[in-house]
Amino acid sequence: MLTNADREQIIAQYQRGESDTGSPEVQVALLSARINDLQNHFKAHKADHHSRRGLIRMVNTRRKLLDYLKSKDLGRYTTLISQLGLRR
């Protein structure tokens, strides 16, 4: 689970402006952190199907945000996926 300090650190790293919290880069970075936390959760709790549904929803949301960013600005997209280490 992400703490507020972790969340603020991610926002500070990926924000485009001083008060930016909603840009696609920030949203994708926060979703990626939550997805990674849930993947670690599933290593210990394999039968947690309710949370797995939430994980799939987060992955789909992240994919849609990445597709949007790719259509709007390819440079920002490639920079973001290289920073996050995504395999797209």
UniProtKB/Swiss-Prot annotation:
SMART domains: Ribosomal_S15. The keyword Ribonucleoprotein applies. The keyword GTP-binding does not apply. Pfam families: Ribosomal_S15. GO terms for molecular function: rRNA binding; structural constituent of ribosome. InterPro entries: Ribosomal_uS15, Ribosomal_uS15_bac-type, uS15_NS1_RNA-bd_sf. Keywords: Ribonucleoprotein, Ribosomal protein, RNA-binding, rRNA-binding. PROSITE patterns: RIBOSOMAL_S15. SUPFAM superfamilies: S15/NS1 RNA-binding domain. GO terms for cellular component: cytosolic small ribosomal subunit. GO terms for biological process: translation. One of the primary rRNA binding proteins, it binds directly to 16S rRNA where it helps nucleate assembly of the platform of the 30S subunit by binding and bridging several RNA helices of the 16S rRNA. Belongs to the universal ribosomal protein uS15 family. Part of the 30S ribosomal subunit. Forms a bridge to the 50S subunit in the 70S ribosome, contacting the 23S rRNA. HAMAP family: Ribosomal_uS15_B (MF_01343_B). This is Small ribosomal subunit protein uS15. It comes from Psychrobacter arcticus (strain DSM 17307 / VKM B-2377 / 273-4). The lineage of its organism: Bacteria, Pseudomonadati, Pseudomonadota, Gammaproteobacteria, Moraxellales. The gene is rpsO.
